[in-house]
A protein has these predicted regions:
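Short, surface-exposed acidic
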Residues: 90-94, 133-137, 198-210, 247-255
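Short, glycine-/small- and polar/acidic-enriched structural segments
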Residues: 1-99, 103-109, 113-120, 139-141, ...
Length: 270
């Protein structure tokens, strides 16, 4: 969330942020000079992560169960839309407010049956806590009716208008980085550790692989290249967002994303 106002004020020319948060920000700050220019998480990592041994394998198992959800969690914010898309009666779920640090430990201890969170983060946290991987069920909301997109590269529009070639070159570099990371996740994790020596290379490689497979290298991206969006899906996503957010003004897709700095056909990443 911090990236959006910093880019909007010009403190930074580019950033990386959830496009749904950007839509809300522009609704609340009309005319702010910020927009998305490259989609990265074609499927957002919003998920319900549960344990099969506790009876959670799919959306239909959530009624009658205990769900741990941090109130400010991004995945929890989208849960009503996910529930609506799957005909889930939220009133039949016992929702347990939990803190971020206690979310996965409570699931590991069996105090809740599932939690909301980012798919790859919650999954790896559970593995580190000793939960067998074959006991973990990851219910990615994007695979179960959630139309929303995820994180995108955002720009200050005033900067972009004055420095279009720089923005295009930057997006090309981002795409090249992803292409290399997809081809060799081990080398990508090693580069991350070089930047942040405190990071665990094996853990970050696994996190990267999970994100690539579920969120970045989707069927749409394989067919259409990286960076762009499907206009029909984006319109549906904007409409679906209204189930959990009250727009102050009529939403306008053109304000939230532009492909003006992308190559025709997007960036091939595979």
């Amino acid at each position: 969330l911090d990236a959006i106002p910093k880019v909007a004020t010009g403190a930074f020319p580019v950033g990386f942020a959830d496009i749904n948060s950007l839509i809300k920000f522009l609704d609340q700050n009309p005319g702010a000079p910020v927009t998305a220019v490259m989609m990265v998480y074609d499927k957002p990592p919003f998920a319900v992560v549960g344990r099969k041994s506790l009876g959670i394998s799919g959306p239909g198992d959530l009624e009658g169960s205990v769900l741990g959800a941090p109130p400010p969690d991004g995945a929890w914010a989208q849960f009503p839309s996910f529930a609506k898309a799957n005909n889930i009666d939220i009133g039949k779920i016992k929702v347990e407010p939990v803190g971020f640090p206690t979310r996965e430990p409570m699931l590991a201890e069996g105090k809740v049956d599932s939690v909301t969170g980012f798919s790859f983060s919650s999954y790896l946290n559970l593995v580190r806590l000793g939960v067998p991987e074959n006991d973990i069920s990851t219910i990615l909301m994007a695979d179960h009716g959630l139309k929303l997109y995820g994180n995108a590269v955002i720009v200050n529009t005033e900067y972009a208008e004055a420095n279009g070639d720089t923005v295009k070159a930057f997006l090309g570099a981002v795409a090249a980085g992803w292409k290399d990371a997809i081809a060799d996740p081990t080398a990508a994790a090693a580069a991350l550790v070089k930047r942040n020596p405190a990071a665990d290379a094996a853990l970050e490689e696994r996190r990267l692989e999970l994100a690539i497979n579920a969120n970045v290298l989707t069927d749409y991206v394989k067919a259409n290249g990286m960076g762009g969006i499907d206009s029909a899906r984006f319109s549906a996503a904007i409409k679906q967002l209204s189930e959990t957010y009250d727009y102050k003004a009529a939403p306008d897709a053109a304000l939230y994303f532009t492909d003006a700095y992308l190559p025709a056909g997007g960036f091939p990443v595979k």
